[in-house]
Amino acid sequence: DGYYYAIVAEGGTGYGHGINVGRSKNFYGPYECSPYNPVMRQKDPAAPIQRAGHGKLVQDQNGQWWCYYLCGRPNEGNYTTVGRESALDPVQWTEDGWFTVNEGKGPSLTQIAPDLPECIYERNLFDDFNDTRLNLEWEFVRNPDNGSWSLTERPGYYRIWTRDGQL
């Protein structure tokens, strides 16, 4: 449609977290704010799903648009034991060229799966750790501490040394 869309997280990662949108015909701006902002935010403080934000739009093979975002399910102490979960809600494009997520109702309580064929994972999920290097499936976040693990300490095993810390 000739627009650049800036999809931004606002409100931190706690309660009040949400997704706002701006758009511009020029990548460098200026950007106008969506009249539907926030396009995703939990407005009900008693709802079971909170902290909805950090979203991205994706389009599936059938042309349906979705918003993939993070959220949390707090327990009685307002802690999210499972941490930041991933969620998926449908996107609706409006007549004025903007979009809303889940018709502006906030996070769905039940996730709706896209109408796509099942994708079978073809890779072998077995690793005997008999190589001198870890397979790519053992990806590290950021730079790995190579002194905290070994494939040679006990051949055929992935040896990991933990460190002291509080959980």
Name these PLM-found stretches.
Residues 1-167:
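Carbohydrate-active catalytic/glycan-binding domains of CAZyme proteins
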